[in-house]
A protein has these predicted regions:
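N-terminal secretory signal peptides that target proteins for export/translocation
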Residues: 1-10
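Bacterial N-terminal signal peptides
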Residues: 10-24
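Beta-strand-rich domain onsets/edges
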Residues: 30-68
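Extracellular Ig-like/FN3 beta-sandwich strand-entry sites
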Residues: 66, 120-124
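Short edge beta-strand/loop segments characteristic of extracellular beta-sandwich folds
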Residues: 68-74, 112-114
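Aromatic sugar-binding surface patches on proteins
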Residues: 105-112
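Short, exposed beta-strand-loop hairpins at the edges of beta-sheets
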Residues: 115-116, 125-138
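Short beta-strand edge segments in extracellular beta-sheet folds
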Residues: 143-147
Length: 147
């Protein structure tokens, strides 16, 4: 899989990682799955946490009603490439497909997907993560309530 290599400064990378790391400290919005020596990290955070310059550098949208879903996969301390697909379903049963975009800078690799949310929205995520480093695709399911 060929990955885009967007430009950007180290400061932009720092802000993006800080925004993702901030949300990783919130137990209700993040998680980790361990499959042998492969670790899958996932989190959800408001797109407004991404500084405007970082969002522009990576063609990301910032909006009050937009959440970012962040997936990263590592084998040891090395990021690994993956194909990620999936859907999000709200409490009314309305489903939407999430398109994940790889973000690559230096030694970091993240996959970000955008999800529009309504106030006090409850969402179920059904994602498939596939990588040559994994013996089989992993079905990741989690639920989040957004305020």
């Amino acid at each position: 899989m060929a990955l885009p290599r967007p430009g950007g400064s180290r400061l932009q990378l720092w802000w993006l990682m800080a925004a993702m790391g901030l949300c990783a400290t919130l137990p209700a919005n993040s998680g980790e799955i361990i499959l042998d020596d492969v670790h899958i990290y996932y989190s959800a955070f408001p797109s407004r946490l991404i500084p405007p310059g970082v969002a522009a550098a990576h063609d990301l949208t910032r909006a009050e009603n937009l959440m970012m879903i962040n997936i990263s996969i590592k084998q040891g301390d090395q990021p690994i490439e993956a194909d990620i697909s999936g859907d999000v379903t709200n409490i009314l049963g309305q489903a939407r497909t999430i398109r994940f975009v790889p973000i690559v800078e230096q030694d970091a690799l993240y996959y970000l997907g955008e999800v529009i949310v309504d106030e006090k929205d409850w969402l179920r995520f059904d994602l498939t993560i596939d990588s040559d480093s994994m013996s089989e695709p992993y079905e990741l399911q989690f639920e989040r309530r957004f305020y």
